[in-house]
């Protein structure tokens, strides 16, 4: 499971770090669709995120969207560098452009997600 990326219907990738810890970010396909990301509003450290609810807000050259979370958990790490420089989202959405790390309330279930972007 570790090292694999799973993809949600919300255009968010999920990278399991441990059974209950995952890293989340925007799929490259969605980044290409949105165009140049100009600004991001990320959740605060310690925030409780619910599946299907707002994970972050992205403003691009084309539109502004709410990105929905594919899983529920507590934010234990935030890529705050993105708030000052969105370059990693635009050029490395599936690596350096990650959004947050969540502590899940239960073990990650990859069966619900796709391995294809």
Swiss-Prot record:
Q: What is this protein called?
A: Glycine cleavage system H-like protein
Using the record's annotations, give every residue carrying the modification N6-lipoyllysine: 62
Protein source organism: Chlamydia muridarum (strain MoPn / Nigg)
Q: What is the lineage of its organism?
A: Bacteria, Pseudomonadati, Chlamydiota, Chlamydiia, Chlamydiales
Q: Which UniProt keywords apply?
A: Lipoyl
InterPro entries according to UniProt: 2-oxoA_DH_lipoyl-BS (IPR003016), Biotin_lipoyl (IPR000089), GCV_H (IPR002930), GCV_H/Fam206 (IPR033753), GcvH_Chlamydia (IPR017514), Single_hybrid_motif (IPR011053)
The Gene Ontology biological process annotation of the record reads: glycine decarboxylation via glycine cleavage system
Cofactor dependency: (R)-lipoate
Q: Name one GO cellular component term.
A: cytosol
Q: Write down how the cofactor binds this protein.
A: Binds 1 lipoyl cofactor covalently.
Q: Which ranges carry the Lipoyl-binding domain?
A: 21-103
Record bears the keyword S-adenosyl-L-methionine: no
Q: Which Pfam families match?
A: GCV_H (PF01597)
Can you tell me which family this protein belongs to? Answer: Belongs to the GcvH family.
> Which PANTHER family does the entry link to?
GLYCINE CLEAVAGE SYSTEM H PROTEIN, GLYCINE CLEAVAGE SYSTEM H PROTEIN-RELATED
Whichever gene encodes this chain, its name is gcvH
